Amino acid sequence: MPHAALSSLVLLSLATAIVADCPSSTWVQFQGSCYAFLQVTINVENIEDVRKQCTDHGADMVSIHNEEENAFILDTLQKRWKGPDDLLLGMFYDTDDATFKWYDHSNMTFDKWADQDGEDLVDTCGFLYTKTGEWRKGDCEISSVEGTLCKAAIPYDKKYLSDNHILISTLVIASTVTLAVLGAIIWFLYRRNARSGFTSFSPAPLSPYSDGCALVVAEEDEYAVQLD
């Protein structure tokens, strides 16, 4: 494959990765999702008020699907976000089939309940205890929350991206295409010049002042002197 074409593929891959990233440095990427902790204490009447903090940004309350994700959230809450001791998870108790479900409609494939005992009711919520990483059951009827953890899948919905982010992504793609075209042109010119460098050999034209011509002129001059 020509070097220009290979370079173009690499640049296009980089551009795609940039566009697919989380919308800003506020968000943290892990396992194909973007996470943001909104450090705002809000008064709530029900859990939907908390969800709205996330849905307004094209995300939903956090769901957790494996031990690695749980550990990542715990570590980031402790070191970067400085979250509360008890973080409200994006789940609800469905009395129809007596199971917990995630608000983002993903499957409940993992749990880390510290205690499975107790009766689960319609107003039972799940909390992540950030000291240990275990989950606890609690009452959804809370008056306030100290921060909300939101999660969005990648690619992030572009309608929630800022105008500056869209502009930067567009410029990156345009620059990539331009570089790819220039690379192809340079490669084409290089190949054409390389082929035209092998020209056939042709003898140099005989100069009127070569040795043979000089000898003829000298003989003519000598003959003219004899006639005189």
Curated annotation (Swiss-Prot):
GO biological process terms on file = phagocytosis
What are the protein's UniProt keywords? Cell projection, Cytoplasm, Disulfide bond, Glycoprotein, Lectin, Membrane, Receptor, Signal, Transmembrane, Transmembrane helix
Q: What is its membrane topology? A: Single-pass type I membrane protein
Entry's localization field = Membrane; Cell projection, Filopodium; Cytoplasm, Cell cortex; Cell projection, Microvillus
Q: Which Pfam families match?
A: Lectin_C
Annotated CDD domains:
CLECT
Annotated disulfide bonds: 125-140
State which ranges are Extracellular (membrane side): 21-165
Residues linked to a glycan: 107
MF terms in GO: carbohydrate binding
Q: Which domain of life is it from?
A: Eukaryota
Q: Does the keyword Cytoplasm apply?
A: yes
Q: C-type lectin domain location, by residue?
A: 30-149
According to the record, the signal peptide region is 1-20
Task: Name the Gene3D superfamilies on file.
Answer: Mannose-Binding Protein A, subunit A
Keyword check for Disulfide bond, yes or no. Answer: yes
Q: Which InterPro entries match?
A: C-type_lectin-like (IPR001304), C-type_lectin-like/link_sf (IPR016186), C-type_lectin/snaclec_domain (IPR050111), CTDL_fold (IPR016187)
Ranges per topology, Cytoplasmic: 187-228
What are the annotated GO cellular component locations?
cell cortex; filopodium; membrane; microvillus
Q: Which residues cross the membrane?
A: 166-186
Function, as annotated: Potential multifunctional C-type lectin receptor that may play roles in endocytosis and phagocytosis as well as in cell adhesion and migration.
Name this protein carries in UniProt: CD302 antigen
* Taxonomic source organism: Mus musculus
